Amino acid sequence: MTEDKKTIPEEQVEAEQVVVEEVEAELVENDESAQPQEEAEASNEDLNMIEVLNKKLALAEQQIVDQQADVARAQADVVNARRIAAQDVQKAHKFALVKFADGLLPVIDSLEMAISHADKEDETLKPMIEGVELTLKSMLDTVDKFGLKVIDPKDEAFDPEKHQAMSMRAVPDVAPNQVIAVMQKGYELNGRVIRPAMVMVSKAED
């Protein structure tokens, strides 16, 4: 009797074995179903990371573009500043030359007047006249190097841009609008008239 009590019935053993197998199968199934889920979660994390990195890359590229634009604008500003500075220097230089020429013209006029009114027949005055003529020539040669040119339009056609008509006179065998006399020479500085020549102009005969 005692041995029969200790012996586990075969049916019970089989039942317990079935339960164990079912549990093991369920564990395997749960493990297999969890693996794709974990892989999916890992894949989603990778995609999120890639998206974040792409956004950071796009932001960095935009910052580079903006910085390049800033550099280009800065370079353009420097070029413009240099150009404006050069123009200002050039204008100041021209203005200084104009002021210098304006102050010098009366001196030239006085020397020319002294020569034209001098008695060239007087032998005692010849050395002085020659000295004044040399001084005038030297002065004109010097100012010519700085762009100051004489306007002396005798026998030329009247040009209202460079000449100022003081009077008109009919002269035989001379076509109208010709400069027949120059009362005062004019001057231009680097192509710009700073004083027109005062002239007498021919007109048609009545």
From Swiss-Prot:
Participates actively in the response to hyperosmotic and heat shock by preventing the aggregation of stress-denatured proteins, in association with DnaK and GrpE. It is the nucleotide exchange factor for DnaK and may function as a thermosensor. Unfolded proteins bind initially to DnaJ; upon interaction with the DnaJ-bound protein, DnaK hydrolyzes its bound ATP, resulting in the formation of a stable complex. GrpE releases ADP from DnaK; ATP binding to DnaK triggers the release of the substrate protein, thus completing the reaction cycle. GO terms for cellular component: cytosol. Keywords: Chaperone, Cytoplasm, Stress response. The keyword Chaperone applies. GO terms for molecular function: adenyl-nucleotide exchange factor activity; protein homodimerization activity; protein-folding chaperone binding; unfolded protein binding. CDD domains: GrpE (cd00446). SUPFAM superfamilies: Coiled-coil domain of nucleotide exchange factor GrpE (SSF58014), Head domain of nucleotide exchange factor GrpE (SSF51064). PROSITE patterns: GRPE. This is Protein GrpE. The keyword Secreted does not apply. NCBIfam families: PRK14150.1 (NF010748). It is found in: Cytoplasm. The lineage of its organism: Bacteria, Pseudomonadati, Pseudomonadota, Gammaproteobacteria, Alteromonadales. Transmembrane segments: none annotated. It comes from Psychromonas ingrahamii (strain DSM 17664 / CCUG 51855 / 37). Homodimer. Belongs to the GrpE family. It comes from the Bacteria. One of its GO terms (biological process) is protein folding. The gene is grpE. Pfam families: GrpE.
